[in-house]
């Protein structure tokens, strides 16, 4: 069954964009997934297809109208597909979320613009509000591309090796270990000897240690969650 993505946006020409290249592009051509970009302007009001209005309570910018947004959502009929709204106000997008989305029939992604979407439309349509980081973009389209790419690569048959999806950052709650390739020595920097040893158990242990070290130093939030999940303490590492 083809994994279906529908994107509701004011800029449909942004899709598939970079998702038409590389692994995602080949999977798109091969029918492993599909993407349809619907122009929210089609659901706008009046001769000028108005999609936004001034915010109640005052303030800068414009807000996307609930009647326009909800009409678009109901027209695409998510049919079991989660409705996701990328926004800095959302909960952090996690790899567990990505796996859940990728394991289903697809996604409907609503891309906001201006000051965002009227909250009533999001509540009425049961949108999942997710954030890809603590920063602000011009609109939801770039975040939608990030979200879709993270999902598409987990669809069976997209990546060349199943291990690629299980031996990477966040697959076990830790950041991934570092990678090396030829030449073995480059500008005075050598590949760690253990990776050249052929001792698979020792290599696996080294990679685990490197993952733990990177997570502890770069992502203390993930490290704290790892300690809680495993029941270990810092002193044991």
Swiss-Prot record:
Per its record, the protein catalyses: guanosine(37) in tRNA + S-adenosyl-L-methionine = N(1)-methylguanosine(37) in tRNA + S-adenosyl-L-homocysteine + H(+)
Q: Which gene encodes it?
A: trmD
What is the E.C. number?
Answer: 2.1.1.228
Q: Name one GO cellular component term.
A: cytosol
Pfam families on file: tRNA_m1G_MT
Which GO molecular function annotation, any one, does this entry have?
tRNA (guanine(37)-N1)-methyltransferase activity
Q: Where is this chain's protein located in or outside the cell?
A: Cytoplasm
Function of this protein?
Answer: Specifically methylates guanosine-37 in various tRNAs.
Q: Does the keyword tRNA processing apply?
A: yes
Task: Give the source's domain of life in one word.
Answer: Bacteria
Primary location recorded for the protein, binned into one broad class? cytoplasm
Q: Which UniProt keywords apply?
A: Cytoplasm, Methyltransferase, S-adenosyl-L-methionine, Transferase, tRNA processing
Provide the family line: Belongs to the RNA methyltransferase TrmD family.
The UniProt record gives the binding positions of S-adenosyl-L-methionine as: 112, 132-137
Could you tell me the Gene Ontology terms of the biological process aspect for this record? tRNA N1-guanine methylation
Protein name as catalogued: tRNA (guanine-N(1)-)-methyltransferase
Quote the InterPro entries the UniProt record gives. Answer: Alpha/beta_knot_MTases, tRNA_m1G_MeTrfase_C_sf, tRNA_m1G_MeTrfase_TrmD, tRNA_m1G_MTases_N, tRNA_MeTrfase_TRMD/TRM10
């Amino acid at each position: 069954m083809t994994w279906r993505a529908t994107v509701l946006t004011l800029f449909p020409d942004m899709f598939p964009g970079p998702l038409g290249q590389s692994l995602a592009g080949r999977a798109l051509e091969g029918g492993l997934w599909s993407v349809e970009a619907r122009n929210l302007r089609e659901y706008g009001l009046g001769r000028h297809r108005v999609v936004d209005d001034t915010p109640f309570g005052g303030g800068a910018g414009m807000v996307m109208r609930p009647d326009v947004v909800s009409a678009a959502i109901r027209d695409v009929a998510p049919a079991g597909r989660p409705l996701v709204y990328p926004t800095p106000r959302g909960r952090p997008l996690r790899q567990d979320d990505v796996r859940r989305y990728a394991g289903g029939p697809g996604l409907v992604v609503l891309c906001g613009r201006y000051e965002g979407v009227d909250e009533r439309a999001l509540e009425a349509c049961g949108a999942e509000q997710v954030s890809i980081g603590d920063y602000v973009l011009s609109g939801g389209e770039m975040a939608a591309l990030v979200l879709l790419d993270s999902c598409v690569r987990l669809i069976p048959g997209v990546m060349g090796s199943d291990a690629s999806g299980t031996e990477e950052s966040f697959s076990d709650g830790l950041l991934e270990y570092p990678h090396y390739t030829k030449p073995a020595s480059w500008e005075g920097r050598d590949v760690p000897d253990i990776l050249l040893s052929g001792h698979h158990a020792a290599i696996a242990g080294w990679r685990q240690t490197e993952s733990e070290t990177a997570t502890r130093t770069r992502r203390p939030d993930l490290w704290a969650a790892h300690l809680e999940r495993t029941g270990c303490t810092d002193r044991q590492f």
